[in-house]
Design a protein with these regions (language model features):
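An acidic/histidine-cluster motif and surrounding catalytic segment
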Residues: 1-91, 101-128
Length: 128
């Protein structure tokens, strides 16, 4: 389990959610290994590949609720690949999951670029 300032991160997540017109209800972060993430991806999404984040959206109206599975193994390797600290990449993935709960997709080149831009804007508000 990563050492996070939960109050600071929670306040940040609530502020980002509010920018998109949402309150935060119950968001569970499940930090796991690549193997656990792959098992979840196979079982629930039918995808046979590793990924850094899987978001299950249970939101209602304007309240964000969901489970966000985050592979700490992939976060670590992604951080090394892009020259970021582990904490910086972890916060990118945390907010990526939150943005999915707001309805932001990332399947097409256009929506992926939008997601990256929104991640950057959010990360600018949180100095890690």
């Amino acid at each position: 389990m990563p050492a996070l300032d939960e109050r600071k991160v929670g306040k940040w997540i609530r502020a980002v959610a509010a920018e998109y017109g949402f309150a935060v209800g119950n968001i569970n972060y499940i930090f796991c290994s690549d193997e656990r993430e792959l098992a979840v991806n196979r079982e629930f999404l039918g995808h046979d590949y590793y990924t850094d984040v899987i978001t299950f959206d249970y939101s209602t109206a304007q309240t964000l609720n969901g489970d966000i599975f985050i592979s700490l193994d992939t976060v670590r390797s992604n951080a090394e690949m892009v020259g970021a600290t582990f904490e910086q990449e972890l916060m990118r993935i945390v907010i990526h999951g939150v943005l999915h709960l707001t309805g932001q997709g990332d399947k097409s080149p256009e929506t992926k670029a939008e997601m990256t831009e929104k991640e950057e804007r959010a990360l600018d508000k949180l100095k890690v």
